Amino acid sequence: MITIENLHKYFENKKVLNGVNLHIEEGTSSVIIGGSGTGKSVLIKCILGLLTPEEGRISIKDNLIFENGKFKKNNKIKIGMLFQGGALFDSLRIWQNVSFYNIQNGKNKKFCFEDAILNLEKVGLNKDVVNLYPSELSGGMQKRVALARAISIKPDIIFFDEPTTGLDPISADVINKLIIEKVRDIGATSLTITHDMSSARTISDKIYMLHKGEIIWEGNKDTIESTENPFVVQFINGLSEGPIN
């Protein structure tokens, strides 16, 4: 589904991605873990085309979308995204946020409004919130709205950027379970970046660890606890001492 080959990204003289190789199977939920500044968000932005890598190849659904420093347009691939913090539009009502894609593509107001209600119901929110603004909702409810927006286009792939950041443990667990359920319902492939190991263990089929711009470990969530990789051991146990500094 998603294949990344020898991907490099620099910012001035700093190498952020250093030859990343990654293959994500269709219909799976993959999670990339790693500390702050390890290149997780940069990798997602490169896949989305928000940043241009210096070198490497990116393919999605057997379609080559990036090679030789250039992106190739492909309108056949539908992508959903839940940004860190939700990234809702403060000036738009909740239904307008959820139906933003449909509104931008000229769908009529009645369709957009009703479709927003349907997608909000899928994440456990009722029609009482549709005319509110994001600032009138709690952080957990805003994340649900963002998830409703991400699934509204029935995407082939959904990217999640730190989906539980800023949430209390109960709200985080709700979001994790909604991610599992909704990704399965629409048959999407998902890729999540997080430093929250509880979330990673809950939603993943496979886990990758990114450190200093390189994938240094990969495996399923059942094997990560038994790995002897010192970087992984330090990270998943939150240890101050170890090779990560």
Where on the chain are the PLM-derived regions?
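Catalytic Walker B motif of ABC-type/P-loop ATPase nucleotide-binding domains
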Residues: 158-161
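Conserved ABC ATPase "signature" region
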Residues: 110-128
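Helix-to-loop junction immediately C-terminal to a conserved catalytic motif
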Residues: 48
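Conserved ABC ATPase signature
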Residues: 133-137, 141
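ABC ATPase NBD coupling module
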Residues: 65-80, 104, 224-227
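Conserved catalytic motifs of ABC-family nucleotide-binding domains
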Residues: 154
